[in-house]
Amino acid sequence: MSHNEKIQDENKLIAERRQKLQKIRDTQKIAFPNDARPTHKAAQLHRDFDHGDEAALSQAGTVAIAGRMMGKRVMGKASFVHVQDGSGEQIQLYVSSDALTEEVYEEFKTWDVGDIIFASGSLFRTKTGELTVQTNAIRLLTKSLRPLPDKFHGLTDQEIRYRQRYVDLMVNAQSRDVFKARSKIISYIRHFFEARDFLEVETPMMHPIPGGAAAKPFITHHNALDMPLYLRIAPELYLKRLVVGGFERVFEINRNFRNEGVSARHNPEFTMLEFYQAYADYNDLMDLSEVLFQGLAQTILGTTKFDYQGTEIDFSQFRRLPMRDAVCQYVPEAANILEDAPKMVQLLKEKFHIDAGNESDCGKLMTMIFEEGVEHLLIQPTFVIEYPAVVSPLSRRNDENPDITDRFELFIGGREIANGFSELNDAEDQAERFKEQAAAFEAGDEEAMHYDGDFVRALEYGLPPTAGQGIGIDRLVMLLTNAPSIRDVLLFPHMRPE
């Protein structure tokens, strides 16, 4: 069947269903009743009675089920229906004219797959052993005007699955499982930090000054105040203000927004966990992260070793690797030129086809080589440490080498999953770094940070020794659900207009 024929066929079915709905309206019946109260979920019935004997089934009494009709077989005066409810499972109904009035049964025969119905009755087991509700009452709750995807071919168009997630969730159990796992992951994280005396907080989503990360912001305008506002790219500067104020352990799970590209790993709107702990350093946070990730894997998957896109990931051990060592190991031709900016610029151009222009800062150039030549090779959990200070404007300098910072990024499966560091709490140093960032912004770097005078003022009151970290929830869910694209773990990912 051609695409046009499919559209014509679907339009014909929609027209037929609209006629059925109009017939219901014409009989002066309530077309969309809202008084059905189910007593059980399909999953609950299967759990409690799949292996029960006849005595157990009879003791169950009357059960009431509500859900979407996913299958229907009419055989004269008797029919079988499969209903799927919010538990994600289906239960079979046996519907016969003997148990219903002739009028009700005739109405039932006109209902379509996709309709939402309510039924009550007693449990029994068919000759094939399937748990079934012998229906003595049945009602139409919501008339579905659009047919579900063909049950044999399903919803195979990936783009339609993203655009019409509501249909995807109806027909794809795997998609439902992903989002149930996502909810479980977030719940575990929340309890993990609460158990360690972290306070969950909420900080602004609209900022007068963009900051907290190197990214291009979304810009909006506040009419009443006649001022520009920026959707937050990170909550970092507000969370550290709270530590200044005396909340020594805080965390937030919320959205960030970055006006950048869309890819298998990037969505303009994404969920981030950020947490800050006073009297801790980046080593403490790496230790804490290992415990968090191992506990998550054990809870969600039942193991710390799991498959991700054909590769076994092992959460039982995490490597710690200085960035310089990583570059030397994975890009050996860079090992002897990391202090020679012109040669690094040449290497970036010849090996990675990256034009670094007139960049002369070796720290920036080494980071560029790392991003192009190393990141995607870090499959097993690896904390890359000792980031150059020039690319870490909010991080504390290393005591022994002020050109690097006490910062790490965690890579798993070739992707950055987390970023953390001992926080810069020297107000004067922070002010100077903000000035450098502001100059870079004025020179055309749209991802450079702005000067945030209020944050500097907060630091002047005194930020205790603190470490902070951000973890990308979406990428973490991708790992733990074996999802190849970030769109697979976002209920409603951003898409181009149809």
Curated annotation (Swiss-Prot):
UniProt keyword terms in alphabetical order: Aminoacyl-tRNA synthetase, ATP-binding, Cytoplasm, Ligase, Magnesium, Metal-binding, Nucleotide-binding, Protein biosynthesis
Positions contributing to Mg(2+) 1 binding: E409, E416
PROSITE patterns documented for this protein: AA_TRNA_LIGASE_II
InterPro entries, per the entry: Aa-tRNA-synt_II (IPR004364), aa-tRNA-synth_II (IPR006195), aa-tRNA-synth_II/BPL/LPL (IPR045864), Lys-tRNA-ligase_II (IPR002313), Lys-tRNA-ligase_II_N (IPR044136), Lys-tRNA-synth_II_C (IPR018149), NA-bd_OB-fold (IPR012340), NA-bd_OB_tRNA (IPR004365)
Keyword Calcium recorded: no
Cofactors demanded by this protein: Mg(2+)
MF terms in GO: ATP binding; lysine-tRNA ligase activity; magnesium ion binding; tRNA binding
UniProt feature coiled coil, ranges: none
The enzyme's E.C. designation: 6.1.1.6
GO biological process: lysyl-tRNA aminoacylation
Entry GO CC: cytosol
Catalysed reactions listed for this entry: tRNA(Lys) + L-lysine + ATP = L-lysyl-tRNA(Lys) + AMP + diphosphate
CDD domains reported in the protein's UniProt record: LysRS_core (cd00775), LysRS_N (cd04322)
Binding of Mg(2+) 2, residues: E416
Compartment(s): Cytoplasm
Enzyme class: ligase
Entry keyword Aminoacyl-tRNA synthetase: yes
Subunit structure: Homodimer.
HAMAP family found in the cross-reference section: Lys_tRNA_synth_class2 (MF_00252)
Name assigned to this protein: Lysine--tRNA ligase
Organism: Dichelobacter nodosus (strain VCS1703A)
